[in-house]
Every structure is written in C-alpha cells, then in structure tokens.
Amino acid sequence: MPAFRSRTSTHGRNMAGARGLWRATGVKDSDFGKPIIAIVNSFTQFVPGHVHLKDLGQLVAREVEAAGGIAKEFNTIAVDDGIAMGHDGMLYSLPSRELIADSVEYMVNAHCADAMVCISNCDKITPGMLMAAMRLNIPAVFVSGGPMEAGKVTLGDGRTVKMDLIDAMVAAADEKVSDDDLTRIEQAACPTCGSCSGMFTANSMNCLTEALGLSLPGNGSTLATHAYRKELFLEAGRRAVELCRRYYEQEDEGVLPRAIATKEAFENAMALDIAMGGSTNTVLHILAAAQEGGVDFTMDDIDALSRRVPCLCKVAPNKADVHIEDVHRAGGIMSILGELDRGGLLHRDTRTVHAPTLGAAIDQWDIGRSNAPEARELFLAAPGGVPTQVAFSQSSTWDTLDTDRETGVIRSVATPFSKDGGLAVLKGNLAPDGCIVKTAGVDESILVFAGPAKVFESQDAAVYGILNGGVQAGDVVVIRYEGPKGGPGMQEMLYPTSYLKSKGLGKACALITDGRFSGGTSGLSIGHASPEAASGGPIGLVREGDRIEIDIPNRTITLAVPEAELAARRAEQDAKGWKPAGPRKRKVSQALKVYAQFASSADKGAVRVLPE
C-alpha cells in the first residue's frame, strides 16, 4: 500500500530535526504515524464571503483530530471581485486564481500533507483550490462558507423588494432612483456574511463542486448563517480522514480527485451549470481545472452540452426575485441534478466523496424522489432575516418545501424555462475559437441581433461612453484588449452591463468583449471572445460602424466585413502590433506582466502556458 506522504517528514533518523519542528507546532509522540490533513482556509476580513471563516478551520481541525488525523491549517489569499470592480484592482482578480492554486501546491507539497479540506467560497478561491486539488491528486473534500441571505428593502414608495449587490450597482447609475432610496438599497443589499446571494460566480462554482462529486450535498445552497451548515464542516473533516485511510491503507485510488472528477463528472458539472444558468466565469474555471487534472474537456464539449440541456432554473440576475435561498428551499443542487437525471442528461455512475456514486447521492437527497428525513430537514433551512457576520447563527425554517416542478424555482425537463440551456458557445469569424453568452439572462426579443459596432479600447472608455450618451439603442458595444494578456488579467465588465441597464439599453444593445463578465451580468453580453485581441484575434480588427450579427439559436457570431478587407486590416495590424489604438491610463505591475507573459486565451481557461 502507498505510504502516507507525511512519512517523508515524520519518520527516520534523518528527520529528527523535522520532528522537532512538528513537535513545536503541537504534534505529540503518539501523533506520528497519523495522516496529516491540510486545512486550506481562506479567511479574510476583506471579503464578506470569507469574513466568517476565521474559526471554521479549527472547527474542522478538531473533527479531523477526533477522527484520528493531524490537522494543520494554513490560509490562501482571497480577492473580493465586487470591491475590486470598476478600477485597476480588477486586473488582479483572475490572476489570483493561479496564485491560490500555486500556494496550495507549495504548502501541501512542502510539508508533505496527506489530504486536504478546502474551505473556499468566493469567485477565484474555489476555482484556485479546485485546480490545486486536481494538480496534487491527494484526497480532498471541499466545503464552502455558504451563500449570503438575500437583501430586503422597503423603498420610499412603500414597496418591499428582495434584492442583491447588483441592484445597488444598477440603482447607483439610474437617475430615477432618489438618493434616499439608493441609501436604503445600499444598506440592505448585502445583509449577512456569505457569497453574494444570486447565481453569481461564487455560488455557481460552489454548486458545481456538488456535481463534480468533491463536496457534500447542500454545499452550494445552505446559507452561511444557518446552523445546518455547521454539519457540512464537521462532516468534511471526518470524510477527509476516511478518504485518506481508504487511499493510503486500503489502496483505493477511487477516492482521489482525478478518479472522482473524471470527464463524465465535468460533463455533469457543465450540464448543471447550463441547466441553472450559472455564471459564464464557470466556463473558464471548469476548463482550467480539467486541464490541471489531464481531463480532455474543451469548449466543444460545452457547446455540445449546451445544445441538449434545457434551462431548469433561473436565479438572480436572470430572475430578479429568486435567490440561492429559494433554490435551497426547492431542493438545492441535488434536486436540479435529479431533474437532469430523470431527463437522461446525467452520468449517474461518477464517484463522490460522500456516496458510492452520484446517482446514489441523488436517490438519497433529491426531494423529488426521496423521503429521507435528513433531506427534508436540510432543505427547509431558511434565512433568518437578521444582519450578521456570524456563521451558523440562526436556525429558521421554511414552512414548506417548493416541490412544484411545473412553475416553481426548479423545473422538470418536461416543463423547463426554455428548451435551450442557460449558457451557449457562439463561433464565427469574430470569434473562431468561441465566445460565451449566458442565454438565461438574454431577453427572447434579442436572441437574434444585429447592429453597428461601437468600439472601445478599454472598459474605462466604454463606461465613459455609455454614461455620456455615446451608445445608442441598436448598437453593438465592443470592448477589446481586456483579455488575459491584453488587460492583463481579463477584467469583468459588470459596470458597462449595469450602466446599459440603468440607461434603459439592457434589451436594446449587445456587448462583446475578450474580457469576461461578473456572474451578476445579464443581457446580451458576450464574453471570452477567442482569440483575444492581444493575441491577434479578429475582435482586434473591428472598426467603428462595422455590422455585427449575433444568432444565438444557431450559435453564430459574424463580423459582416468582406474577407479581403479583413485580410488587409490584419496586415496593417500586424505591422502596428496588436495593442490598443491609443494609450491607456493603466499601470501594469511586474506581477501582472508575468501573468500576461504566460496567459492563454479564454477558450483554454486562461491558464498559464509555459514554453516547451
């Protein structure tokens, strides 16, 4: 059987010094020989999704030690995309994913840990830890901090509405919203700790870990504030020790991340993503994680899935009054997976960290087929309605579960929100390697759209143009040189899309970029155009007034310019160099320049590609 990795630093005469250091951390003589479980935490006071994680690492650690392991905690960085949004801080968000993956690898390999519990939550942290887990391929269990409760606000006209962070951003640019109402919205938008309350990137990724088989049922939807979430943390600690012993003592390689997150598991995760209209950022992260694990999963696989998986769930920003807490009441991710399973759209035989197969897990936890009391109790967990930064601080329950699969929050394959799924891959001469649109957030009236290009060389220029009347109904806004290399860092375009909404252009314009979008974006917003402009992509050839044609049903995006003209433009651009037409007021640090040097385009997950 394989020896514990940790024996490298705990056994043998030559490790006397290392054992001395282990003892200085609290390890006792009787502990040597036990598996060392790394508790990979991401606590920070900068991020509401992580502000409550400070003591949760030690909560897991105590459970690990009670189960017979040695627990050792360390932290990763965590960037709050909402706070970093709209300024140069956003340049650092996507590159932080690689730093997180690297830091986990560095700590785990340097100290020879045997397994991991990954305590993540927000946008780049779950993907970074997922990449590390696939790279390291040691037993790993994911448990996230959980979603925030949705905000509720009573406006000056007496209306009480549910809302979230994106509503605050849109309201800020809407001149019809009074200062008093804006203050009310701002104060109510983010009432508790946790990842922002819609189906944004953080919650999307935490939901996908359930489909991948690397987290426990309820991980994606149980509120950060609810007492039931505590059991997920405790069980994660116990499971990590169990998986560790199964691998090292029983030679069960089926518990390793690459045996669990196979190509079929990635297909399950993307089927879920498409069915629930998840953030387009998930495409980047799923592609990156697959590459780390040597899984042959590409944009073509995502395209194929998007053509046969329907949209079964719409959550903010795609449906303003529905939030993750409502998905939870409807049975959470296990019930969406259950509906996909009934429709023959799921691989049931993939493994998980908690059940022999995903199918077995669905049979136990899908409220549409299971009468298990533990499932009913879990999904009755409701918001407490009290602002707090304290985890597990309330135990409110819904009166009833939402089991309506015809008109409820989660629909059946027979009665979907739409036959087409919530994400689509478009290709054409404007994006030969593909681009992504969240169709769940696109109004049916603009699924086919054409208009003249309004070209901006940066997000900042686009924001200025939108706010100052430079964009009109019918325009196709093009924002380029914002890709992984060109930004660098592939900024999110949440402010341009939010400002289009606030100007009443949300259903009257399209936006295309080689950058990316926040999970909070909706509208005809097409991102990840590949290749990016800085890599010679055709988006760099678009000129003001060029006609751009978008056909989502047929999955095409076309720059309606003759090929001879495009060839002439390419020759001209080759001579000039692929860079913005004018200088940008943007300071690019050495750290970002290093990232840009090795970053691939979005269709490859924006991972680093090293020279051979």
Curated annotation (Swiss-Prot):
What is the recorded name of this protein?
Dihydroxy-acid dehydratase
Organism phylogeny: Bacteria, Pseudomonadati, Pseudomonadota, Alphaproteobacteria, Rhodobacterales
InterPro entries in UniProt? Dihydro-acid_dehy_C, DihydroxyA_deHydtase, DiOHA_6PGluconate_deHydtase_CS, ILV_EDD_C, ILV_EDD_N, IlvD/EDD_N
What family does the Swiss-Prot or TrEMBL record give for this protein? Belongs to the IlvD/Edd family.
Q: How is the cofactor bound?
A: Binds 1 [2Fe-2S] cluster per subunit. This cluster acts as a Lewis acid cofactor.
Q: What is its EC number?
A: 4.2.1.9
The organism named in the record is: Cereibacter sphaeroides (strain ATCC 17023 / DSM 158 / JCM 6121 / CCUG 31486 / LMG 2827 / NBRC 12203 / NCIMB 8253 / ATH 2.4.1.)
GO:BP terms for this protein? isoleucine biosynthetic process; L-valine biosynthetic process
The record's subunit annotation is: Homodimer.
